[in-house]
């Protein structure tokens, strides 16, 4: 089957020599589209082990990742689908603008200390009137859209009459009281615009209940947290796109300041790895996955570019994500409140790509051919040597993958 890049078929994507040719075509395209970037990248790729500031490497990767994304999109002829993914991300921006600029900055300060607001019928009617401007939009998105429009009106009214400013102020106050009322209401508990990090108590991380008064040693988990097995159906309720993007926006993109402790760990002044209150070392991701960089690409609406970044250090990411480890979360810069849920974001990025046309094949290609991986940008041909891998857990199958890319024949047993 011919691909979207002239001269390549789908079968070629499994042939090491053709992957090398594909890498050359990619490089020619970047050199033509962005010569300065290609010169910088070529110098980096020529000596990947040379000492460089971490921020410089991060900058190169996040600038090159969109080129990889566009090239792969063209290769599989899915430009329309990737544009749709970007538009879907952009459509959520209103939610997070409202969450930060209105709810966090204007509403939360009014409810600190347990103060309960008083919502009048007039306030409720005002909010209904504001939301009615977005018919056919589900309630959370409509509230966010109405709130953002109201903030825009407020900015425009600064140069208007006293009556205009007073009318906008009255609407804003009504919306503030409405949000404060429903901030913790059962009906809106799942809304991302009302989900904010809670303080972390290190000695109460696991919620328990003691159902037997005369047997305090009997402990059970909250009923709402239980997953009841039904045959062989998947009971893992991974996050939806809104919750994933909520935590992407929660991340402060520490890589730009070389403070991405989720990747590099938290260190004492003497260079030793810090430990939390439970004595757990905060070493960060054991794979040194470029987490903050992934978040930046995903925030920009480019899940394919984000996955390309992930697969440099974690090519077997379908086996990680929220299923295995959370070392990155433990070392997140947020130590006194809930951390960014990086594993859920990683799973979300992978899932977004798998949902694209040819998604599984795209993921597979990125594990064999990835220009961002300057140490091994494409798989090598068979070198005549065979290796037996015993044990196919996460370490075993990852080792097998890397050996295959280095040209070894691999037999795995478990």
Where are each of the predicted segments found?
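Ferredoxin-type iron-sulfur electron-transfer modules and their immediate structural context
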Residues: 6-381
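N-terminal Rossmann-like FAD-binding beta1-loop-alpha1 element of flavoenzymes
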Residues: 385-411
């Amino acid at each position: 089957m011919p691909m979207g890049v002239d001269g390549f078929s789908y079968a070629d994507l499994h042939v090491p020599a053709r992957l090398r040719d594909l890498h050359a075509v990619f490089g020619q395209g970047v050199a033509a589209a962005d010569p300065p970037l290609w010169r910088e990248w070529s110098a980096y790729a020529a000596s990947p082990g040379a000492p460089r500031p971490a921020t410089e490497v991060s900058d190169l990767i996040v600038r090159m990742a969109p080129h990889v994304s566009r090239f792969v999109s063209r290769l599989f002829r899915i430009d329309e689908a990737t544009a749709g993914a970007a538009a879907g991300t952009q459509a959520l921006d209103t939610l997070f603008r409202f969450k930060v600029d209105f709810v966090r900055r204007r509403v939360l300060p009014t409810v600190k200390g347990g103060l309960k607001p008083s919502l009048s019928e007039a306030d409720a009617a005002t909010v209904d009137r504001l939301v009615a401007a977005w018919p056919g939009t589900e309630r959370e998105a409509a509230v966010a859209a109405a709130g953002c429009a109201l903030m825009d009106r407020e900015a425009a009214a600064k140069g208007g009459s006293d009556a205009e400013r007073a009318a906008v102020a009255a609407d804003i106050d009504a919306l503030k009281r409405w949000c404060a009322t429903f901030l913790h209401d059962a009906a809106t508990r799942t809304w991302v615009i009302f989900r904010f990090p809670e303080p972390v108590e290190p000695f109460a991380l696991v919620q328990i209940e003691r159902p037997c008064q005369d047997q305090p040693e009997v402990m059970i988990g909250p009923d709402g947290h239980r997953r009841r097995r039904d045959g062989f159906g998947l009971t893992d309720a991974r996050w939806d796109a809104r919750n994933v993007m909520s935590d992407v926006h929660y991340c402060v993109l520490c890589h730009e300041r070389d403070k991405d402790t989720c990747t590099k760990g938290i260190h004492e002044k003497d260079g030793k790895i810090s430990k939390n209150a439970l004595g757990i070392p905060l070493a960060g991701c054991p794979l040194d996955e470029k987490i903050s960089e992934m978040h930046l690409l995903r925030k920009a609406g480019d899940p394919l570019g984000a996955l390309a970044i992930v697969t440099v250090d974690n090519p077997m990411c379908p086996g990680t994500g929220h299923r295995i480890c959370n070392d990155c979360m433990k070392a997140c810069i947020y130590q006194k409140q809930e951390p960014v849920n990086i594993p859920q974001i990683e799973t979300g990025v992978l899932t977004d790509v798998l949902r694209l046309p040819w998604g599984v094949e795209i993921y597979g290609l990125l594990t064999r051919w990835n220009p961002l991986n300057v140490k091994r940008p494409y798989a090598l041909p068979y070198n005549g040597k065979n290796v037996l891998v015993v044990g196919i857990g996460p370490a075993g199958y990852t080792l097998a993958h890397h050996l295959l890319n280095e040209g070894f024949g691999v037999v795995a047993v478990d």
